[in-house]
Amino acid sequence: MAAKDVVFGDAARAKMVEGVNILANAVKVTLGPKGRNVVLERSFGGPTVTKDGVSVAKEIELKDKLQNMGAQMVKEVASKTSDNAGDGTTTATVLAQSIVREGMKYVAAGMNPMDLKRGIDKAVAAAVEELKKISKPTTTSKEIAQVGAISANSDESIGARIAEAMDKVGKEGVITVEDGKSLEDELDVVEGMQFDRGYLSPYFINNPEKQVVQLDNPFVLLFDKKISNIRDLLPVLEQVAKAGRPLLIVAEDVEGEALATLVVNNIRGILKTAAVKAPGFGDRRKAMLEDIAILTGGQVIAEEVGLTLEKATLNDLGQAKRVEIGKENTTIIDGAGDARNIEARVKQVRAQIEEATSDYDREKLQERVAKLAGGVAVIKVGAATEVEMKEKKARVEDALHATRAAVEEGIVAGGGVALLRARALISGLKGANADQDAGIKIVLRAMEEPLRQIVTNAGDEASVVVANVIAGKGNYGYNASTGEYGDLVEMGVLDPTKVTRTALQNAASVASLMLTTDCAVAELPKDDAAPAMPGGMGGMGGMDGMM
């Protein structure tokens, strides 16, 4: 086992604070509309240019082990905030640095770190309550666009794209971000439910130009097993043929005689049909078939519920306004399912999301909610170079997370003003003793810091601006991008409540852990001695025997 370096008290804390400051100083230059870029070296390819706090934090690894511990703890603040709220990483880092800096002064003066922590926790809990009270729900598309624009470093076109996407697929719909092929950003919207299974035979294609199968007003047959015997299908096919409407078959597989018969009927124009495999695997396949059934107002024909193919009637089949099937995807548009049943199903899947333990399961469940609730939108990011594309794509993803957070918990005035207003409301808070009061004071001081940093990055005098904003009321604040004072909500400078709340909670959590640290254990660097010179090869005598 490697030897350890054990450092106690102020010496340990001082080294960790140095690490905190190195990381926080690198991250905080990116804060606000006039924040600067940070260039990150890559081991291969060109460097990455970013204004995203968490991307900068993740790159920082310090040589000194104790400094690195401090830096890694603040990196955790940025990562946690990014994971929970999707934005606010730089704000969280600035808050954490301030709480650590102020807190260390009190610890050095001999105050009890545990009481300081209790005071900090009390102040943060009170501030979060006040933030929730001053928060207002996002109601308009314009507000969503403004939140997106602020999070994307004041890029209004990104905010507008996200608002447009949310308009089209609903606030529950899935919005994904991909690399575009042109210089402009594009928005592709897939309405209805789309799943990644295409036609089982190209002979079903009835639109040769687009190479797709289009079925108008079809019945939808859902079966959870393989279909290989046409006899099982005949009763349903006859009923559908009498109704004179097309049929989409979604089953585990359709093969052999059954597939051949469907193809022949299709070519001869006797019955317009198409067959696709059911999406997913195992239990997920059953769940997705059930989703399609609820969306189309049909039933999954399964032996478990006492239904068989031979006895299936038109009442068991789902219906849709249109179905489009490509080589790799099937889209069901405007299913005939009951809106109440769909809503109940969405609630049920949401409950499963709450209980899901793995990120993969959660992501798949969220996709199912989106497919049931609205649709899928894809924002294709356009840029001139790959470096610009990466940077812009990261900003679009940030903005997307921020708008989701705004929809979830509402919005507050941006530009660090919400924290100042919450601070004013809790300024009378008292702890159980003087040390707890000092903990409360630490948080009150830290809540000014984001505004100070935004103003500093904009090149103005922080103390003057903070004093002016404190003198104002409500949403009155400083718009750093224009250099004007006024109602920030009207100016469109908004922050999601969830982002501001999460930043404060995570910063206080990690910073107070650091204040209560009294010993740090780090590995000592190993002295790797240079390897010895290799000896000559044995058995090589003189050259006498060669004569």
UniProtKB/Swiss-Prot annotation:
Reaction(s) the record says it catalyses: ATP + H2O + a folded polypeptide = ADP + phosphate + an unfolded polypeptide
GO cellular component, one term: cytoplasm
UniProt entry keywords in alphabetical sequence: ATP-binding, Chaperone, Cytoplasm, Isomerase, Nucleotide-binding
Entry EC no(s): 5.6.1.7
Pfam families: Cpn60_TCP1
Enzyme type, top EC level: isomerase
Record-level Gene Ontology MF annotations: ATP binding; ATP-dependent protein folding chaperone; isomerase activity; unfolded protein binding
Listed HAMAP family: CH60
Entry similarity comment: Belongs to the chaperonin (HSP60) family.
Oligomeric and partner information: Forms a cylinder of 14 subunits composed of two heptameric rings stacked back-to-back. Interacts with the co-chaperonin GroES.
Name of the protein: Chaperonin GroEL
Native source species: Ralstonia nicotianae (strain ATCC BAA-1114 / GMI1000)
Gene: groEL
